[in-house]
Amino acid sequence: MTHALIPRLALAVCFWILGGVGNIAFSGLAESGETRGARGKLAVTGRYNVPITELSGLAIVRSGEKTGRVAGTTSISLYAIGDASYDVASLRIDSSSGDASMRVNDVAPVLGKHAGNASQWEAIATDSRDTICMLSETRSEVSCLDLNLHKELGTFKLDVSGIKRLDHVWEERPNSRGEGMILMKNGHVLILKEKQPSMLIEFGPKGDSPMGYDSDTFLQDGEAFAMPQSKVWVALKIWEFSDRLGELAKDASEITLGPDGRVYLLSQESSTLIRLEKTLKADEEKITVDHDAYWKLPAGIEKAEGLIIDEQMRPWIGIDIKQKDKSNLFLLSPIEAGN
């Protein structure tokens, strides 16, 4: 069944790039993917073309201040980044018509970077209030800005030296570091390590104890991320994948917090969306899937790297392609919420 967001086959949508006018394309279609053991079908219900080369991360602004919609409207607000530039795309999409407006900002000058250099950004996260942060994989740093993308709030180095096993694989494989990020309470962040091996890592101020995660460790509606005073975030704890999670996810491309308060993982190599366990304790050693809750992505979605889930439990998937004239953002049919 095609959702109301797709009223027509193709739709031209306006956006502004640093004051210039262009178009992104939206179209509706129905392509599904189903695998034995997966929970139902996922179908592509909308496509967009975001002019970000090698799109690598998505974040949703749950404003209003508690939903993914702009107050008084039925719009969804998203951010998108790529690893090839310092461009940040801000999208507002009308849930009913599919109309979208977008602004693309080159934030290199704000961060004191050279515009022509690759950002190596692989993840983006926001507290939906006044902070947005981008994770640079090979540089092992997180840069934070205000939501208007006009002010730098801080750049933080990731220090993994305190965990010997992590330090070894981090240095040995710089292209298999951070691929996903969630902001938490107390200035802590969860960062997803891509592969060899895949891990979930909790970073925070030096001397802090790891929290793990549950409903009390994630930022609540309207709660601001507590920016640490130290410019170094220390690895406090690692959780490797359980055998079952490793079977479902050959790599780890993105994590996001859904509107149901649950953590979802995207695997590019396995073309799979997975709901992780509800509670992860600090004294546990591994992280696993929640009651085998996983969904295969529809055929044709390759190199999936960005993931958010909107208020209607619809996954949005961003793909990493070099072509700017092809669809790289896909809206999928809803998944069931976690308990």
What is the predicted role of each segment?
Residues 23-339:
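Sequence/structural signature of beta-propeller domains
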Residues 10-23:
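Bacterial N-terminal signal peptides
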Residues 1-13:
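Bacterial N-terminal signal peptides that target proteins for export
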